[in-house]
Amino acid sequence: MCTARTAEEIFVETIAVKTRILNDRVLLEAARAIGDRLIAGYRAGARVFMCGNGGSAADAQHFAAELTGHLIFDRPPLGAEALHANSSHLTAVANDYDYDTVFARALEGSARPGDTLFAISTSGNSMSVLRAAKTARELGVTVVAMTGESGGQLAEFADFLINVPSRDTGRIQESHIVFIHAISEHVEHALFAPRQ
């Protein structure tokens, strides 16, 4: 029988996951390197794309908003697009082809070498996200995979991997948001912070 966890138990679990991340130099270095990659890309005129399904789609859209809007201080927008946000494209491609190709087809029409794709999937095995990552690699687009502990099949296509050390979907998604904020803040400060 499955019993509901208390709020206290969930907070203990989320703190434990964040502590594992804090002690994982590889993950923390990956976040810094991803931020540096975005900074270099933006300086060269590149764009950033994100994709995911369900809660990961919400994370993708949140990330795009941090880049096109702002996180810490007012500044010019940065090019970023959550690929699921165009509902007409999504429903047309899903209807006329299949759902697994919705993100890949959007990339084929918009992405170019030097751009970056954030492929977000807690399992690392979402077929639509996998196809997007494969297409991105074929197009010369850098792939950042954001997954759970195993990395799933998505790890095979990743230039950079953020694999949160957990198998709990909620804890993975919470950690993805922390990484999204950390990367966004790093990029924003590097590109727009006033020089002292």
UniProtKB/Swiss-Prot annotation:
Alphabetized CDD domains for the sequence: SIS_GmhA
Enzyme Commission identifier(s): 5.3.1.28
Catalyzed reactions per annotation: 2 D-sedoheptulose 7-phosphate = D-glycero-alpha-D-manno-heptose 7-phosphate + D-glycero-beta-D-manno-heptose 7-phosphate
Entry-linked HAMAP family: GmhA
Other known facts: The reaction produces a racemic mixture of D-glycero-alpha-D-manno-heptose 7-phosphate and D-glycero-beta-D-manno-heptose 7-phosphate.
Subunit architecture: Homotetramer. Interacts wit HddA and GmhB.
GO molecular function term, any single one: carbohydrate derivative binding
Impact reported for S123A: 4.4-fold decrease in catalytic efficiency
Domain named SIS: residues: 38-196
Effect of S126A: 6.6-fold decrease in catalytic efficiency
Subcellular location: Cytoplasm
Cofactor annotation: Zn(2+)
Enzyme kind, highest EC tier: isomerase
Function: Catalyzes the isomerization of sedoheptulose 7-phosphate in D-glycero-D-manno-heptose 7-phosphate.
Binding site for Zn(2+): H62, E66, Q173, H181
Species annotation: Mycobacterium tuberculosis (strain ATCC 25618 / H37Rv)
Keywords, in A-Z order: Carbohydrate metabolism, Cytoplasm, Isomerase, Metal-binding, Zinc
SUPFAM superfamilies in the record: SIS domain (SSF53697)
PANTHER family recorded: DNAA INITIATOR-ASSOCIATING PROTEIN DIAA, SEDOHEPTULOSE 7-PHOSPHATE ISOMERASE / DNAA INITIATOR-ASSOCIATING FACTOR FOR REPLICATION INITIATION
GO cellular component: a single term: DnaA-DiaA complex
Entry protein name: Phosphoheptose isomerase
GO annotation terms (biological process): carbohydrate metabolic process; D-glycero-D-manno-heptose 7-phosphate biosynthetic process; positive regulation of DNA-templated DNA replication initiation
Residues the entry annotates as binding substrate: N53, G54, G55, E66, N95, D96, S121, T122, S123, S126, Q173
